[in-house]
Curated annotation (Swiss-Prot):
Belongs to the universal ribosomal protein uL29 family. The gene is rpmC. One of its GO terms (biological process) is translation. GO terms for cellular component: ribonucleoprotein complex; ribosome. One of its GO terms (molecular function) is structural constituent of ribosome. Keywords: Ribonucleoprotein, Ribosomal protein. SUPFAM superfamilies: Ribosomal protein L29 (L29p). InterPro entries: Ribosomal_uL29 (IPR001854), Ribosomal_uL29_sf (IPR036049). It comes from Buchnera aphidicola subsp. Cinara cedri (strain Cc). Pfam families: Ribosomal_L29. It comes from the Bacteria. This is Large ribosomal subunit protein uL29.
């Protein structure tokens, strides 16, 4: 999902996605530290997805002020 599509999603759905990504990030970091993670690119991808969602949410907050 790109940034334009994320701009059109409602706030509650974005927050749910953010929570899911944060849980996934936790699991990825656990696997990475234990040496079981085979797909190391997921660390970077997950981090960027979290940043994109936070950016959209912050734009909405700042735009309403």
């Amino acid at each position: 999902m790109n940034i334009i599509e994320k701009n059109n999603i409602d706030k509650n759905h974005l927050k749910k996605n953010l929570l899911d990504l944060l849980k996934e990030q936790f699991n990825i970091r656990l696997q990475l530290s234990s040496g079981k993670l085979k797909k190391t690119h997921l660390v970077k991808k997950n981090k960027k997805d979290i940043a994109r969602i936070k950016t959209v949410l912050n734009k909405r907050i700042n735009h309403t002020l």
